[in-house]
Amino acid sequence: MSAVASVKDFVSSFMLTELLKGMALTGKYMFSRKITIQFPEEKTPLSPRFRGLHALRRYENGEERCIACKLCEAVCPALAITIESDVREDGSRRTSRYDIDLTKCIFCGFCEESCPVDSIVETHILEYHGEKRGDLYFTKEMLLAVGDRYENEIAANRAADAKYR
């Protein structure tokens, strides 16, 4: 390092130029419009592709959509989905057990993409919690209840996203 460079470094550090540059940047944004959102009171709009709490859907006649193909179970990278199926008298398969462990789930959306009948979907519900570990273990009945309750919202989001699928 030359003497001139070391003198420049000394003067720069002595005059606190980095500190002044930082203060100038802070001053520049101090009086601009605030963009912080106070979350529980204010909510931002969510994309139709947002991946939140899972739900199982039914057909309009009330029959559950899941045909127990187990594609979602096979494609799940976190191994969060467990499915058991039974064969009906007419030869069709339906699930007898469909469980999702949300403590394992990484919300990748592969289950939703792989489903051939749009049975498993991820809703816009992002405010859920559990007081115990078992509270985040969703059974088939719980997932169907979520799907029944939010079917109109799910259908609207699927329709808004249909041209991109």
UniProtKB/Swiss-Prot annotation:
Membrane topology per record: Peripheral membrane protein
Boundaries of every 4Fe-4S ferredoxin-type domain copy: 57-86, 96-125
GO molecular function: 4 iron, 4 sulfur cluster binding; iron ion binding; NADH:ubiquinone reductase (non-electrogenic) activity; quinone binding
InterPro entries: 4Fe4S_Fe-S-bd, 4Fe4S_Fe_S_CS, NADH_quinone_OxRdtase_chainI
EC number: 7.1.1.-
Subcellular location: Cell inner membrane
Binding-site residues, [4Fe-4S] cluster 2: C76, C105, C108, C111
Presence of keyword NAD: yes
Cofactor(s) in the UniProt record: [4Fe-4S] cluster
Protein name as it appears in the record: NADH-quinone oxidoreductase subunit I
